[in-house]
Structure formats: C-alpha cells, structure tokens
C-alpha cells in the first residue's frame, strides 16, 4: 500500500499572534453587539509589556478599548510578567480612526444600500474545503493539532497541570493513503508539543503529563502505535513565552485558522473584520458550501473558491473541485452550489447571522479554528441539504 505523510500545526490561545487575533475579535464583538452596522478593521500587535490596537472603525457603539484589551489578556491567563504579560499593568496603546469615506461609499453607500446591494469590502478570493476523513468533515491532521492545543489550555486552566503557562504550539503528522482522490488516515506518525512551563518542573514531568493528560484524551488509540514518534518540548526549555518571548500580530495564523495546509487559502485573514470584509464572510460561505457537498454524499472531498471586486455585490467567479471523488460531475455540483448559496456579502451576513456580536461570538473563533466547530454561533458549519436533479 502506497502512503504519504502530511503535517498540520496549531498554536493555543496564549501564543502572541493568537492573543492579537482574540483582542481584535473581542473589539469586533463589542462593536457589533451595540451596533450591528459597525464597520470594523481592527489590528492588534504586542511585545513585552505592551499591546496596541489600531485600524479603522466606524460605529455608534461606545467601546472601552483599553478594558477589552486587558480583559482579553487576563482571560487567556496573562496575569504577570513572569508568564509573558501582565494584563493589569502593561501599556495599552490605541490608534483607531474611521473607515475611509472612499471605501464606505463604494461598499455600502454610506449605509443607504439594501443588503443585496452591499458590495464586497475589497477584492480577493477565498476557499472553502471539506473532507470525509473526520466527523467534522475536516482534515485529521488539523483536527488533532487543534484539539491538542485546546486540551493544553484546558488542563492549564483547571489546574490538572499547574506548571503550564499560556503559550504553546502543537503539530501532528499523519500517514495517509490516497483512495482515488479521498484522503484516508492510517496512523499518527509524529506528535510534537512545545509548551511554556514554570521554572521548577522537570522535562520528565512535562513529558509524562503531556502524554497522560493531553495526548491520550485527544488522539484516538487506533491511530497510535509503537512506532509513533513523540517530541515533547524538544528544545528542553520554554519558560519565557507569550509577548515576552515573541512579538505578536493579528492575522499571522491563517492556515491554523482554516484547514492546516489542506485545500487552499486566498491569503486574507479573519480576525478583527466585520462581515462586509469578504476575507471573512466569503471564506465562511464557501466552507458551508464545501461541507454541504460532502455531507450530502456528492463527493468525499471538495474545495470551493469564490472571488470578488471591491464595491461589487455579485461574485466574479465560483469554482468547485471534488478531486475526482464526486458522484456527479463537478459542473453539476457547481450548479447546485450556485442555486443554494447566495454569495453576495450583504446576504451572507444575513443568512449566516454574521451581524450578531457579543457573548464572545467572534472571539471564540480567534483560537482553535474557525471551522469544524460544533457550536451554535458557528452558523457556517450548518449543512444545507443538496439534492441533484433527477
């Protein structure tokens, strides 16, 4: 049997880039909660003892940016300089301006356009992907790497592993076979975890706890064997982490946010962007389309691309490829997608309820992936019934 290896990585919520994603989306939540018509393009950067938010926001909401920054950092676990950042005493810098009136008139006519007329906030192309290799219809490498990161945070916060600190990275290599275009996982080849830790814990304790409390609960036993390789804190020391260890910036973990290197990516990041930004809303609708194709049994694997021009409501193109796993021709699947999904940005926002913020709705997406999540707020994960014409 001919097989191949494929690898996906993830980072958990204490990674400095992910901290920035969460701050940007927490600000988006606050704006949309008070004013669903908010236009938000919020970036965040961080380094030792400093977090800065900057960008363009037009909103009627009254937003305390500094409080949101501190609350978000504190919620992650950055409560002292020792762990990488002190949420209550770090410098918070804010440089927020209003959206360019040139963009505003072209996209939403200064709020005079009907939802179906609202143009894309920028040009670009977005991809959605789905595969039948997991119940989530997501790549196994990505699912496992992401879940390992989430479990690291869980056992840190519930004190199962009190030596853990917020920053951490995971990576999983899976051996696959190609079944006529579909991906079939055979086994987990390698597991890599690098996690920030307290000064006093030994490397032996770290390895033991990671295997028992993180790896075993996450990776199904059927994928592990005596040949599986484990690299657990292979650098030997990871005490300095978070923004103290590395600078962070919104939008630098776009592959982790999506499909772990599978499918394709149109390069636009998600966090800190309201639904008129098709980098986000376009990627959400094509994920729903691709997932619906696979869930309907029309293909075992599917990628969908959509593209836009700034200020234009209708997409420029829609493309589908089922990697030769389709039960009907790709052109017929494309016709079904076009019949069942409205790719106009204003209608995506309505149909996926994307104008609703607050209650951590968008902040939740900013760590542990935007796709494959079984939560009501992830409306784009809801499958549409697709039936080919007789």
UniProtKB/Swiss-Prot annotation:
Recorded superkingdom: Eukaryota
Q: Listed disulfide bonds for this chain?
A: none
Q: Which molecular function terms from Gene Ontology are attached?
A: ATP binding; metal ion binding; methionine adenosyltransferase activity
CDD domains from the UniProt entry: S-AdoMet_synt
Q: Name one GO biological process term.
A: S-adenosylmethionine biosynthetic process
Catalyzed reactions: L-methionine + ATP + H2O = S-adenosyl-L-methionine + phosphate + diphosphate
Q: Which cofactor does it need?
A: Mn(2+); Mg(2+); Co(2+); K(+)
Q: Which residues form a coiled coil?
A: none
- What does the entry's cofactor note say about binding and number? Binds 2 divalent ions per subunit. The metal ions interact primarily with the substrate. Can utilize magnesium, manganese or cobalt (in vitro). Binds 1 potassium ion per subunit. The potassium ion interacts primarily with the substrate.
The residues that hold L-methionine are 56, 99, 246, 277
What are its E.C. numbers? Answer: 2.5.1.6
Q: Does the keyword ATP-binding apply?
A: yes
Per its UniProt record, what PROSITE patterns does this chain match?
ADOMET_SYNTHASE_1
The entry's keywords: ATP-binding, Cobalt, Cytoplasm, Magnesium, Metal-binding, Nucleotide-binding, One-carbon metabolism, Potassium, Transferase
Q: Where does ATP bind?
A: 15, 167-169, 235-238, 246, 252-253, 269, 273, 277
Binding locations of K(+):
43
> So, what pathway does this thing act in?
Amino-acid biosynthesis; S-adenosyl-L-methionine biosynthesis; S-adenosyl-L-methionine from L-methionine: step 1/1
Binding of Mg(2+): at which residues? Answer: 9
Q: Where is the signal peptide?
A: none
Question: Which HAMAP family does this UniProt record tie to the protein?
Answer: S_AdoMet_synth1
* Oligomeric and partner information: Homotetramer.
What is the designated name of this protein? S-adenosylmethionine synthase 2
The top of its lineage is: Eukaryota, Viridiplantae, Streptophyta, Embryophyta, Tracheophyta
**Gene of origin?**
SAMS2
